[in-house]
Amino acid sequence: MKFTLNYLMIKRLGETGGFEYNDISPMNELAPDTEELINGLPVDILSETDEILKTQGITDGELKPAKPISAFIKALFAPEKCLRAELKEENGSSDVYFIPFDGAWLMMNAKHGELTAAGPVSYEIAKEYIKAALSSALENGVLSVQYRDEKCKRSVTVTNAEEGYAFFGSLFDKAERKERVYIHSFAKTEENKKHIAKMLTGEKGFELPEGENEQQDRLSAKRVLRGIGIALLVNICAAVIVAVLKAVL
């Protein structure tokens, strides 16, 4: 299965289907982008979008989402889990989401106002994608990975800094309403690269591998702080930046 919907189509399918997105959904990022897109388009663009959806059989006579697409919109707006990987490189960027769908996962690429969904895929495919994105980021780029579910929100930004692999991590516990911040500059070894990959995919928690001394944390944090400008460029949240500053100063 593979199909593409633009953001306006997704907006209208959500509205006519009566769906509201939760705090796990990719719509937390897509909805603001959609509103920004609408502001630069003709005022009748939504009615034109409705006509296109009806003509293509995506909606019925009452503009309700047809059954096949309705299941996708429901999964998109109210997933139980969501994994996002955003890779920024000098020659471009990619923004990919994974959500559960029909007993497996959907891989969705968000680009230029369109969402291309493909699947079903296994979670192993998602992990392999993140590992490949990490390899690219540690060559010449910045990778931001976010995992969201009903209990927590886990965010990580990784890049290749001058003195090591700069790692910014935050874990927000929804029940306790508390956020914990992790920051470290890893030595540039293959073992550390594998360890970081496992933290990104959730196979490991935020922990240091053997060979990375916790007593070096303060020095490590100071080295990572030099890359704070990079973190800002990839929209790492202000709370993380403040927490990092407090931890180092």
Residue spans of the language-model regions?
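Non-catalytic recognition/regulatory regions in large multidomain proteins
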Residues: 7, 23, 63-241, 245
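Short, amphipathic alpha-helical interface elements at domain boundaries
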Residues: 1-51, 68
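A short, conserved structural fragment
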Residues: 51-62
